Structure formats: structure tokens, C-alpha cells
A protein has these predicted regions:
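Radical SAM enzyme [4Fe-4S]-AdoMet core and its adjacent flexible, acidic
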Residues: 1, 148-262
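Short, acidic, Ser/Thr-enriched surface-loop or helix-capping motifs
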Residues: 269-270
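Generic structural signal for well-ordered alpha-helices
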Residues: 75, 103, 129, 164-167, ...
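Core AdoMet radical
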Residues: 38, 58-67, 81-96, 106-124, ...
């Protein structure tokens, strides 16, 4: 992951948190592979933003995007896998050449096709919204905060308003509306070294405030901690926060979450066609 995310060297720190394996053992838990149900496809690191928290260091200057030949190989693999879910991510998948045809070919191969959308990149692709509706794609969009200041500080000036505009377009197409069958989920991650708040309470707050202030509706909210890799790890190291953040993550271990870890039932294809379990 460090190689994929860009050049960075491990940063020494005074106290290494207990290993994940050690934490599992201390809690009487085992991490075992379950049935593979999900194929995640990372179509590349090209993005229209350069977020400080990005764990793959995506950005406008990245040239790593999935080729048509690799897309064909992924399609062939998906046909053999009988996956319940195909999950397309990036970078900003909206910017990858040929993404429309790729989605068309993947849609019949799994009951659920997920698209992890970049709302500012999607703003320039109304054709993709029409395609999402036709293919019944589940749209999962990053929306970090309910106010412009923290959102723009994390992303870039103007991102908050541009994201709201795209959410309105998705709502107008039926996404996030009761009874439409078109699922729109949001993902919120905190700024800096904060950990996310309780997901249920935060989902209620997002539902309430987005509807009241902006007239926007959605289905689910997922709150995620920032992963200490890539550009975010570099920032943690340069700002002197890496050791404390790792300790904070280790100290916040939730044994109830182990059964739901993505690595138990997911395989991932990178932009260059490498397959990971």
C-alpha cells in the first residue's frame, strides 16, 4: 500500500502500539477469512482534489488509471466469481476514460453495483447520473461535514457548495428518495487527528440538517476514521502526530467490529490488474 500510495518511508516512533494480532488474541478473537462476496475495483488514483487525509495520495497529477485491457480482464474475472457486490472506487472513477462502458458490463454480473462517487467530479458528468439510474447503481458519496468551513478546509475552497449541488441533482434523479429504490449513501470522515463520532447519532444529525437547511435526502451515513497511510501518514509524521494517532486508533479498538471487516469477504483489483485478498 505504501508503494501504491507514493514514495514514503516508515517513520520511527517511540512506542509501537500493540499489534493487531496481539489485540485480537487479548480479546479472545480470531480473524478468519469468510466466503468471498465482494469484488472491489480501484480504477485509479486520478482525482480532481488532493485531500490531506487521502490514504492513496490521489490527485490531479496522478496518471495511474485502469486501461481498457485491464477492464476487460476484470469483467472476465467478475463473470467467474458469482459476486454479490461489485464495488467501483478510486481516485475519482468519474475521470477514468471508458468508465461508462465498464459499468454497463459490470452491472449484470452482480445483484449490487456500488460506485464510490466524487461529488465535484460527478458534477461535470450528468450523463453518468442518467446511467446510474438506468443500471440501478448504488451511489456512495464522500461528504465530510455539514458546514462549508471544515469541508472546504479538508478538500478545497468551493467543494462544499459544489457537493451540495450534485446531491440535489442526484435527488432530482430519484436518488435518496423514499420508495425510489435508488440508494444514495454518504460517507463522513473527520478532520485532522479526530476520530469519528457515533455513527447512528451522526446519521440522524445529517438527515435532519441536510433536509432542513438544504432540502437534501439520502439513505445511509457511514462514519470512517482516517487511515494512517499515503498523504495522511505523511502529514501525521511531518506534524508530529503520527505516534499519538496510532496510539489513539489502538486504544479505540472495537471487538464487535471484527466480524464485519471488509477483508473477510472482499477481494480487490488495483488499477494495474493486481488482485489482492
Amino acid at each position: 500500500l505504501t508503494e501504491i500510495a507514493g514514495p514514503s518511508r516508515p517513520t520511527p516512533y517511540r512506542q509501537i502500539p500493540d499489534s493487531f494480532a496481539g489485540t485480537l488474541a487479548r480479546n479472545g478473537l480470531e480473524l478468519r477469512r469468510a466466503e468471498t462476496t465482494t469484488l472491489q475495483v480501484n480504477v485509479g488514483f486520478l482525482c480532481d482534489q488532493s485531500c490531506r487525509h487521502c490514504h492513496v495520495s490521489a490527485g490531479p497529477g496522478r496518471t495511474e488509471v485502469m486501461s481498457r485491457g485491464t477492464m476487460d480482464a476484470v469483467e472476465s474475472f467478475a463473470r467467474q466469481g458469482a459476486f454479490a457486490v461489485i464495488d467501483v472506487t478510486g481516485g475519482a472513477p468519474e475521470l477514468v476514460p471508458g468508465i461508462e462502458g465498464f459499468l454497463e458490463r459490470l452491472a449484470p454480473l452482480a445483484p449490487r453495483l456500488l460506485f464510490r462517487a466524487n461529488l465535484t467530479a460527478l458534477a461535470a458528468r450528468p450523463d453518468l447520473v442518467d446511467l446510474f439510474v438506468r443500471l440501478r447503481v448504488v451511489v456512495i458519496a464522500s461528504f465530510p461535514a455539514l458546514d462549508a468551513d471544515p469541508a472546504d478546509a479538508q478538500r478545497a475552497p468551493g467543494v462544499f457548495e459544489a457537493s451540495l449541488a450534485t446531491l440535489r441533482v442526484l435527488n432530482a434523479a430519484g436518488y435518496g428518495r423514499v420508495g425510489s429504490g435508488l440508494e444514495l449513501d454518504l460517507v463522513a470522515n473527520p478532520s485532522g487527528t479526530l476520530l469519528p463520532p457515533d455513527q447512528s447519532a451522526e446519521e440522524e444529525r445529517f438527515h435532519r440538517e441536510l433536509a432542513a437547511v438544504h432540502g437534501i435526502t439520502f439513505n445511509r451515513l457511514y462514519t470512517l476514521a482516517n487511515v494512517p497511510l499515503g498523504r495522511f501518514r505523511s502529514w501525521l509524521a511531518s506534524s508530529g502526530h503520527l505516534e499519538d494517532y496510532l496510539q489513539q486508533l489502538a486504544g479505540s479498538f472495537n471487538p464487535c467490529a471484527v466480524d464485519g471487516l471488509m477483508c473477510r469477504n472482499l477481494v480487490s483489483v488495483a488499477w494495474d490488474g493486481m488482485l489482492y485478498d
